[in-house]
Amino acid sequence: MFGGKGGLGGLMKQAQQMQEKMQKAQEEIAQLEVTGESGAGLVKVTINGAHNCRRVEIDPSLLEDDKDMLEDLVAAAFNDAARRIDETQKEKMASVSSGMQLPPGFKMPF
């Protein structure tokens, strides 16, 4: 059942190493900042790995325009930044688990 490369002991060691790598990756993700854009870069929103908004930049030309449009652009820029953080998190976590010899069909929780 647990044959090959060290049996259960080897699997436990792999799991511990993976846990350490995941913790390091999560710490790195928390430090990340990404910027999402909308309106061809007229609105930019920067968020960190915890999805907290760090900065909002609005091109001065938009301040003369429709308030509803500006609100929509800010929301779209935030959503773009959140999508980028999510993609980065998935990439980092996938790289952590890439060396593990997992059973067929095993799904990681990320």
Curated annotation (Swiss-Prot):
InterPro entries: YbaB-like_sf, YbaB/EbfC. The keyword Zinc does not apply. Coiled coil: none annotated. Its main location: cytoplasm. Keywords: Cytoplasm, DNA-binding. GO terms for molecular function: DNA binding. It is found in: Cytoplasm, Nucleoid. GO terms for cellular component: bacterial nucleoid; cytosol. It holds the Pfam family YbaB_DNA_bd. The keyword Cytoplasm applies. Belongs to the YbaB/EbfC family. Homodimer. Binds to DNA and alters its conformation. May be involved in regulation of gene expression, nucleoid organization and DNA protection. This is Nucleoid-associated protein Ent638_0951. It comes from Enterobacter sp. (strain 638).
